[in-house]
Amino acid sequence: MVRHGRLALTRRDSTYSSLAALQRENAACRACAEAGYPLESLPVFEGGAGQRAYLLGQAPGVLEGEQRRPWRGRAGQALRRWLELDEEVFYSTFYCASVTRCYPGRASSGGGDRVPARREQELCAFWREWELRLLRPQLIVTVGLRAARSLLGVRGLDECIGSSFEHEGAAVIPLPHPSGVSRWLNMPVNQRRLTDALALVRTQLHAST
């Protein structure tokens, strides 16, 4: 578990002129721990200036927290299969971020990972907002309902998967989460929605190359 002292450790400037400066301070962020939330890793994100596709997940898993690299577990493998990208192309194509940046730990019930509180999501939104300002991506792919809701305000996956939206000049294409525990894809109509969404992503990626 990430431990912190009595002094605030997180610094946030009022403005950033470079992605590198933003990333340095994001990597050192302990805002959620300072607010009293239990965290099991340090912030996880990956990417560089010039990447025009932005991938927004929900929260790192345990493996991502250990390696401090996004999409390292089985969900990441499934996502790359969906996108038909190998690891090298995947990481060179997408700036990888998430709604909350640290592995939140297991749920108290023992069934899966803890869902980050709304306040945690609000604290982490600062980093996403500045990433999008500095990167100005042409494409944003959200993965999971929490990620889609954070940008689009949607209530459910049914109303957004298979469609393209706009956010500050970028095309936003939501995907469901590729976790094996999700039941959303069990329905044939939702599988068709996923097929449509992936076709939209590929079209956008092709247009940006």
Which residues make up each language-model segment?
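A polyanion-binding, active-site-adjacent surface
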Residues: 3-206
